[in-house]
Structures are given as C-alpha cells and as structure tokens.
Amino acid sequence: MSCMDDKKFTMTLLEFYDLFKNKLISRVDKNELDEFFFWLIDHYCNYSRMDYILNSSFKISKTQEQNLINSIDSLLNEMPIQYVVGETKFMNLVFKLNNSVLIPRPETEELVRWIINDAHTNKNILDIGTGSGCIAVSLSKYLNNCKVTGWDISEDIIKIASHNAYLNDVNVELELSDITKPKFLNYKYDVIVSNPPYITKNEKQFISKNVKFFEPHIALFVENEDPLCFYKKIFDFSNSNLKSNGFLYIEINENFSKEVIKLLKDKGFYDIKLKKDFRLKNRMIKAIKK
C-alpha cells in the first residue's frame, strides 16, 4: 500500500470501539452499547460481528470513520439508533426509516404474528396508519395470496412505505387516506389492522427522550380528553367496510383495554380476544364483525 493510500485509512475498528465506548458508556447500557457498535460497523463498513471478532484491527476509510464519529454525536443527542442508520429490522425484514414514521416495536411484531398464525389466505387486508409499512409489508410477505393495502396521511409516509415494499419484493397498494375523514368504498375487506396513536399527553412525561424528541408525535399521542378517538373512527369504518365475520386486529394502550373492549361490544363486534405482549401488558385485541 502506498503512503497516499495509508492516509485514506487511519483508524482501526478496535480504536473506534474504544472511542465509541468511552464517549457513550455513561449514557448507554453496556449490552446495548455493543449492539449499537456492531449495528453501526455493519451499516457503514459492511463488517459483521464475526468479521470484527476475527480481525478487529481492520482499518476503516476516512469516509467510514467520519460516518461512525457522526453517529456518536447523534447517539449523544439521544437520537434512536434506527434513525441514525436509517433502517431497522422487523419480522426478519429490513425497513428504511426516517423521523416521519415511527420505529416499529417488538409488540407490533407480536400483533403481526398473531395475524399470520391465524393463517389468513386469499384475503383483502387493510392496514390503517401504515407508517413505514412494517405491518402491511410483513403480511404481504408471509401470508399466501393476500391483497394488502396500506393507508396513511402524507405523501412522505407513503413514499417510505412504498420503498419498503419494493425493498422486500412485495406488492402493497399504498393510498393517501385519513381515517378521521374516511372515504366511501364500494367494496369490503376481510381483515382490517391498525396500530393507531394511543399514548395520552398526560403520559408524555413518562416517555423516554429519544422517543419524545425524535419520533413523530402525530403517530404517538392523543388528547387526554378523548384517548379512544382513533378507535371510534376505526370501529365505525370497520362496521361499514369489513365483511360479515371479518377480522379486526388492533394494538392498544394497556391502560384502556376495558374501554376499548366495551366500545367494540357497543359497535356490535363479537368473539373479542385480548392478548398480552411480552412485557405482560394488555397490548392487542382481535374482534370479529357480525
């Protein structure tokens, strides 16, 4: 390697790890710190955990070094790692992200698995508030012969979901639509799913800074006075646009499970099942339309 080439490669990954650890050790849990490190070197250097174990003295380019150092600054500012790298994994699929869409959560994976385990085939499925497309794309990927549609309220969000459908090689019909101003449809769905905003503004004080400062509030929070506002709209729409004996799946705020179930019963849904997430919190509901 020439002297000129040497100038392009100045830091080893081990040296970067030491810098990374020293900067962030007081801010990030040790186990999480290592996960973040390996996520970053895989993203920016295409260097896996095993590659690092076998050769931590690998020299990175100046561009890679700058990207990695910039990522430290972002993490120190409490930006979620998923926004730092611009992507995340969900249901073993890769989804591109920016801060116009929520970061998909493990609880939502549980909701998706519930739908998949119910083995819907040859169904028309609607995802209301699709965001990154994580629910719609995953259902299209893992269910047989289902037509999946995703709705959201802005072109920017639809573009992200569309890109994620393309990346994961699935066909999802993505449409601009606002459930608070539902449009008339002349057809009905077999399955409707939604993970709507459900955190009250009173609960905002308990939300971590990296969520509160970076994730889109419009996808997170509802007014204290009407915490079920989106559920009311979704249930009314589902009453008109779900087929008889069609399925409704929703993610919920654990503090309002009884109220959501009562609302479903009042709207005429039956066989209502409440399911806990991996943290043992009431998190998702399945119901059937009469």
Region annotations inferred by a language model:
Residues 40, 78, 108, 135, ...:
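Residue-level signal for inorganic ion chemistry
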Residues 3-68:
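A short N-terminal interaction module
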Residues 43-114:
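Conserved AdoMet
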Residues 198-229:
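Mobile active-site "lid"/loop adjacent to the S-adenosyl-L-methionine
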Residues 107-206, 233:
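Conserved SAM/SAH cofactor-binding pocket of Class I
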Residues 224-287:
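Conserved Class I SAM-dependent methyltransferase catalytic core
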Residues 94, 147, 171-173, 270-273:
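Conserved beta-strand segments of alpha/beta enzyme cores
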